[in-house]
Amino acid sequence: MLQLTTYRNLQVFLVIMTAIGMSFALFFLQRYMGFSPCPLCIFQRIGLMIMGGFALIAALFHPKSMVIRLLLWLGSLAGIGWAAIVAGRHVWLQHLPADQVPSCGPGLDYWLDTLPMQQVLKEVFAGSGECASIEWTFLGLSIPEQSLILFSILILTHLLILWRIVRPSTPKPLAR
């Protein structure tokens, strides 16, 4: 019988979710709807791509070593954990009272060209007016709220993968 929760199948699931998430963001939200991603959205995409990259390596090479599997899992978890933290911050900014929303800044490109990386991170997480605006909702949820739900599901998937790494399925002996 086919097991859906094998190590390799779970890694392929993560790769597929990355492809769907990135395609939705690029083709639907950016190209079709015409939304430009704010700095926090870009950072969420980077985290999703990091997770997808590690999951792709794990799915393609299917390492047998528990150490290699754990390292790939840790890299993948770091990527999606980063994305979830950024999405959480984004949701928080969207729920601030209007008088507490930070003003719009010059933009991520300008910051990357003129500021050291530590200052860029500080500016991005401080947020800006564009990060606090809600451009589109689906089922009453903003894009960052939907992203946070997706990232939470992917973190739960990582816990299932960890379970598969530390306790791999062993074939049951045939009954006599």
Curated annotation (Swiss-Prot):
Pfam family, one: DsbB
Cytoplasmic side: 1-11, 64-70, 165-176
Membrane-spanning segments: 12-28, 47-63, 71-88, 146-164
Annotated S-S bridges: C38-C41, C104-C131
Record InterPro entries: DiS_bond_form_DsbB/BdbC, Disulphide_bond_form_DsbB, DsbB, DsbB-like_sf
Single Gene Ontology BP annotation: protein folding
Keywords from the named record: Cell inner membrane, Cell membrane, Chaperone, Disulfide bond, Electron transport, Membrane, Oxidoreductase, Redox-active center, Transmembrane, Transmembrane helix, Transport
Location of this chain's protein in the cell: Cell inner membrane
Alphabetical list of PANTHER family matching this protein: DISULFIDE BOND FORMATION PROTEIN B
Functional note: Required for disulfide bond formation in some periplasmic proteins. Acts by oxidizing the DsbA protein.
Record protein name field: Disulfide bond formation protein B
Organism per entry: Psychrobacter arcticus (strain DSM 17307 / VKM B-2377 / 273-4)
Lineage of the species this protein comes from: Bacteria, Pseudomonadati, Pseudomonadota, Gammaproteobacteria, Moraxellales
